[in-house]
Amino acid sequence: MCDECCFIHLGSVHLQGLMAIEQRSFASPWSEGDFLYLFAQDSALCVGLIHAEELVGYALGYCAARDFHLASLAVALEFRRRGFASRLLQQMLLRAKLRGAERCTLEVRAANRAARLLYDKTGFRAVDVRTAHYSGPRDDGIIMERSIEIL
């Protein structure tokens, strides 16, 4: 990882930076309330990536028994294609494994080719499709999973 990068635990103090990345990354962004709700959950994993003292990406999810669900992952537009999303994903899988998770699940828009390529490269496989699950624009949701017993 780059010398100027570190992972942090995210909380409400990071809300402004999270919202800035979220709103530029997704057609249907999470609200402040969505983030605050997740932060309050004991099962939540909320990790940010800091580069040169700036929040450049985040990954959010939660553990349920032996499963971890990756709920959201985003990198600021100007920091994409530098491997930050891969680093965030690996960090989340490691933290989930340390909490006892054996499997990771996620859902991704069918049209999000960059995210699907990332997940394919990191060992996820499509296991189901939620037809017309997303609106604005209408899109299918691809359910993906992978084992995290071995990283």
Segments and roles (model prediction):
Residues 2-78, 82, 89-99, 128, ...:
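Acetyl-CoA-dependent GNAT
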Residues 83, 123:
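Short glycine-rich hinge loops at helix-strand junctions in the catalytic core
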Residues 70, 104-108:
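Conserved hydrophobic beta-strand within the GNAT/NAT acetyltransferase core sheet
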Residues 89, 112-115, 132-137:
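Short glycine/proline-centered loop/turn elements that form peptide/ligand docking sites
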Residues 76, 80, 109-111, 136:
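Residue-level recognition of the GNAT/N-acetyltransferase active site
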Residues 107, 125-143:
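Conserved catalytic-core motifs of GNAT/GCN5-like acyltransferases
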